[in-house]
Amino acid sequence: MDTEPPENWIIDNSNMPEVGTIEWRGWSFASMDFWVDAEDQLRSQFIRADGTVAVVDPDEWDDCENAASFGSYNSILISPLIQLTGQPINISFDSHYRQEAPQQVSLTVTNSSGEIIEMLLHYSSDSGSDNDSGDVLNQRLSFIVETDEDEIYLKWEMYDAGNNWYWAIDNVTIQSQTPPIGDLNYDGNLNIFDLLTLAEILVGVISPDTVLNHVSDINQDGETSFSDLILFLIYIMNH
């Protein structure tokens, strides 16, 4: 059990009472066994979890001192600063969530100044929310983020909770959204403009970055060569 986040991650508990069960005050990091031993109540159904999970659990927090009577449970888990390269990124994680009003959770994207750019997920007791007011147990969630910002943070937040339920996440991955093979101008199409870009790479006009080098290797033999140009030309002529 650990109430400290991994390196470069931040927990913000500044907007909740300094009471309750200490190990469950705000986002905590626990083994599945430790968490389930507190009380099962469907916690054990998070079978996607592997090792230590990140948990917000106002149900267990409230068991000491009737903590929710002092104010609502509000906690934010903030990712390290994510540098962007102008390409979309994919955020994926395993999630295990039980709903009870007035508890709400969200996943938001903010810029380096903390301003919200996009809300990727919102669960609440409202039938119009992403969970349709119900539980969302043992799911793999995935989101694409496209923004002009150079740097962003991700924020997993629980707020307005009393003696309610919980949210656990695990296996967070943040990856570049690599364009399809051959889409050298990243416009979603394979056409003559991509062929011209490939020719420019081969004659040295363009020095490809890692992503561009991947999508220009048409035959996926580990290098970009004139055989890729011929193969791509044949494809363009037949489509």
Q: Each PLM stretch: what is its role?
A:
Residues 116-148:
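Extracellular carbohydrate recognition and processing domains
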